[in-house]
């Protein structure tokens, strides 16, 4: 990439204060302090905004928290009293259902109310009632959502009728259940997510999905409500169907003791950043739970969609947010330092962790707790500088960490090409202001292989149309005078491996 183009990209990305509040220093506020503030609830409010299966760190006592980190660093990173740690001392936890939240849709506490095991079983049986009564077809009156115009027929007082065969439960967890079926009227396969609806609030995931219209985000087709015999209300989201999650795809190769093809990883990564570029700039939404289980793929076409918007939120600089968000292995360091005015860049960190996991076949950072997760990051990334610590939490800047020699990303990914290392290095940064934004990631030469006209990948790229951008929406945040150079780079195809800008 030319110096001029780099300058343009940096300028448009870091001067756009509406897109990212990068000029604002990350501010920290304890969760306890936030709870004491008397604020009116949001119009769209979730019952729970935290993942309840982890212990929340005590950010209120910063000295105690930072001392725990220092003690763990001393015990885990100082080998035999000597500075430094050998590369072969890295021990990533094996991927398992218990550590990585299992198969697709196994753990989605952020979607809605956390449900008991008995409640989930009841929801599953509630869907099976059609089978028990030998009904072959289910008929529902639903609200049809029009993605292009961002309206649904409920707003106009109208509904439509759909029918589908008895469903098959393909996933369930503390959030509810997911089933697959085929809409008879359209002959289209869909996934239906059923969650318990709290009557007091709007469902944030539903309201978020009404805002989305992008090929790399799972689409909302219909939604409807139904009651059980105890008069409890369930929201059903009828969504685009995808064959499997990225987690399941990775497990396929891990079980075969094979690596996922590098070009396949690049296709998924490109579409991930393309989706984030859209989310962060059009509806201005931060997903806040990017992980392999929430990324859906079709391996036959390399198509890709982000799902599960139960944690998604429009981040505003004047409104604090909970810091205990996002699954642990993919949680940005500022969140572990208790940041409440964080930016959309938490999604970029999570995305980099996903790419690294696809390359390694296991999580890059796999801590056993929140503090241990931070130690795992320090083990590889090194001790954060005073400025980086201040950017994550000013309360910690006077603490001095033990001096250790980190295991670098270059050591871990030494078998990968320089472009891969370059992208990971520039997205895995302690300070969110220093991370590439999604558009910068899309311009990386890491993706040039997917644009080569002399390979089979060119056909897949053309079929997916992943290099087609809607200028008014996906590039609408780019200043007019700078768009031509950006568009040229995004659509530039190369004919040989050595060719790059």
UniProtKB/Swiss-Prot annotation:
GO molecular function annotation: ATP binding; protein serine kinase activity; protein serine/threonine kinase activity; protein serine/threonine/tyrosine kinase activity
Catalyzed reaction equations: L-seryl-[protein] + ATP = O-phospho-L-seryl-[protein] + ADP + H(+); L-threonyl-[protein] + ATP = O-phospho-L-threonyl-[protein] + ADP + H(+)
GO BP annotations listed: cell differentiation; regulation of protein catabolic process; signal transduction
Keyword Kinase annotated: yes
Residues annotated as domain Protein kinase: 164-447
UniProt source species: Saccharomyces cerevisiae (strain ATCC 204508 / S288c) (Baker's yeast)
One GO cellular component term noted in the UniProt record for this chain: cytoplasm
EC supergroup of this enzyme: transferase
Identification of the protein by name: Serine/threonine-protein kinase MRK1
Ligand binding (ATP): 170-178, 193
EC annotation from Swiss-Prot or TrEMBL: 2.7.11.1
Active site annotation, chain numbering: 289 (proton acceptor)
Phosphoserine modified-residue sites: 13
Pfam families: Pkinase
